[in-house]
């Protein structure tokens, strides 16, 4: 075996990092709306279909509001926040498991004072995310709970 099979967790100083894993921007700036998110691909192999990634949303940050045909599972590893899944908003905290069904609008938001870190398991080959149209976003905002989620404390 030429490669070390262990990627040691090296985030002892408060940063959640793994040895030999590159810290990347969540997505290209300006490509889609999000705030203060990073990602790390922890596991990907050509002989397996799955991919395990770690995302971290900084305090008061959020992931992209999106949907896609593929299902994915998310386990919260750090912090607390909220997740929108469809028309429902749920509080999430460490070790909660969130299942995102196919073609379901979803977004993760960190709390105001601490980051929200989570593992995300998806197919390595997957469809591209879809963003809501202005009409779809307006329809979502008609739900008062969702509208509050999108605009916490007047954000």
State where each predicted segment sits.
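Ligand-binding loop in jelly-roll beta-barrel domains
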Residues: 46, 82, 93-94, 102-129
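Short hydrophobic/aromatic beta-strand element in the GNAT-like acyltransferase core
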Residues: 39-40, 54, 89, 105
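Short, charged/polar surface micro-motifs in flexible loops or helix N-caps
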Residues: 47-50, 57-62, 80-82, 124
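Glycine- and acidic-residue-biased ligand/ion/polar-headgroup-sensing regions
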Residues: 70-72, 76-81, 86
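A generic "binding-loop/recognition-motif" signal
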Residues: 61, 69-70, 88, 104-105, ...
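Conserved short histidine dyad/triad with adjacent acidic residue
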Residues: 36-37, 52-68
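Short acidic-glycine-tyrosine-enriched beta hairpin
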Residues: 73, 87-103
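A short, N-terminal "cap"/entry segment at the start of jelly-roll beta-barrel domains
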Residues: 1-49, 134-155
């Amino acid at each position: 075996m030429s490669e070390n099979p262990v990627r040691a967790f090296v985030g002892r100083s408060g940063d959640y990092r793994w040895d030999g894993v590159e810290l990347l921007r969540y997505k290209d700036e300006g490509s889609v709306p999000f705030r203060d998110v990073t990602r790390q691909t922890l596991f990907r192999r050509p002989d397996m279909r799955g991919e395990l990634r770690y995302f971290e949303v900084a305090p008061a940050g959020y992931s992209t509001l999106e949907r896609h045909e593929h299902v994915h599972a998310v386990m919260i590893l750090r912090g607390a926040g909220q997740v929108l899944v469809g028309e429902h908003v749920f509080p999430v905290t460490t070790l909660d498991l969130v299942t995102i069904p196919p073609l379901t609008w979803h977004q993760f938001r960190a709390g105001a004072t601490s980051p929200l870190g989570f593992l995300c398991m998806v197919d390595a080959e997957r469809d591209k995310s879809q963003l809501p149209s202005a009409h779809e976003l307006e329809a979502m905002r008609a739900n008062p709970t969702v509208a509050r989620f999108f605009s916490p404390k007047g954000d």
